[in-house]
Amino acid sequence: MIPGEYQLKKGDIELCVGRDSFVIEVANTGDRPIQVGSHYHFAETNSALSFDRKKAYGHRLAIPAGTATRFEPGQKREVSLLPYAGLRRIFGFRGEVMGALDDNSDSGETR
């Protein structure tokens, strides 16, 4: 093996198999490009992005880890969103959640 070399299984690798996703229309109403990373809580993105934030709550872009989607000024496009998995607790971003995404989480913190 060469340092940094990847040795992948033969065939296609499917991401997020069995996870429910949905498509949502997003418009950049601002005058500057906006880039959103793969694991950013989509409901907390830049306020110049216009979309149903309530529907996007607890979701992230359905794109490979480490990548991003760019929204140019005036651009309208559809994106796929996936629900966060695991403990469903998020911290940071714009500070709108800072804990459990769901009221029934055992974390002791709710939105």
From Swiss-Prot:
Keywords: Cytoplasm, Hydrolase. Pathway: Nitrogen metabolism; urea degradation; CO(2) and NH(3) from urea (urease route): step 1/1. It holds the Pfam family Urease_beta. It is found in: Cytoplasm. GO terms for molecular function: urease activity. Its EC number is 3.5.1.5. Gene3D superfamilies: Urease, beta subunit. One of its GO terms (cellular component) is urease complex. SUPFAM superfamilies: Urease, beta-subunit. One of its GO terms (biological process) is urea catabolic process. InterPro entries: Urease_beta-like (IPR002019), Urease_betasu_sf (IPR036461), Urease_subunit (IPR050069). It catalyses: urea + 2 H2O + H(+) = hydrogencarbonate + 2 NH4(+). It comes from the Bacteria. The keyword DNA repair does not apply. HAMAP family: Urease_beta (MF_01954). Belongs to the urease beta subunit family. Heterotrimer of UreA (gamma), UreB (beta) and UreC (alpha) subunits. Three heterotrimers associate to form the active enzyme. This is Urease subunit beta. It comes from Psychrobacter cryohalolentis (strain ATCC BAA-1226 / DSM 17306 / VKM B-2378 / K5). The gene is ureB.
